[in-house]
């Protein structure tokens, strides 16, 4: 992998891995496949996700199939989730506080306990705004919930329609 790890550690090699790409609607298709993998109990030693792959891939590690579709359907028409109004009011097309904090912590609970207990290595990829290079961060048990959510947000950030 080209890029650097923000912790300064060497990126470890995995036995079996899953790459979850970004790309908005492609990410939803990917999550349908990942839900089936979860339901069939097909798991990997490690995975890496960028953008939608990071945002939705965390549900694979937390063993919550169907969660992405459920909250997408539930909040699709809520301006706080994704809208021009959200962009004008918060600076984010996808409301960052709503999507990365209120939904997983209050409205459609993310299973942080299972996520952190799962031994599957999960790498998040974001872009360094100064160099344009990929920055890799492994989501580990010691990572604070807020840090995890902010890394997923950074991975999913889109120029012009995101604050950062």
Where are the model-predicted features located?
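Patatin-like phospholipase
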Residues: 1-50, 58-164
């Amino acid at each position: 992998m080209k890029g650097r790890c923000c912790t300064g550690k060497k990126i470890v090699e995995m036995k079996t891995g899953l790459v979850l790409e970004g790309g908005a609607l492609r990410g939803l298709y990917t999550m349908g496949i990942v839900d089936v993998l979860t339901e069939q109990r097909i798991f990997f030693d490690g995975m890496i996700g960028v953008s939608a792959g990071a945002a939705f891939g965390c549900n694979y590690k937390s063993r919550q199939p169907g969660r992405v579709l459920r909250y997408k359907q539930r909040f699709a028409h809520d301006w706080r989730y994704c809208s021009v109004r959200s962009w004008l009011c918060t600076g984010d097309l996808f409301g960052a506080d709503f999507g990365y904090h209120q939904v997983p912590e209050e409205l459609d609970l993310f299973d942080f306990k299972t996520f952190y207990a799962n031994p599957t290595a999960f790498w998040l990829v974001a872009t360094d705004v100064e160099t344009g290079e990929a920055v890799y961060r492994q989501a580990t048990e010691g990572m604070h919930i807020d840090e995890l959510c902010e890394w997923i947000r950074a991975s999913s950030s889109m120029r012009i329609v995101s604050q950062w």
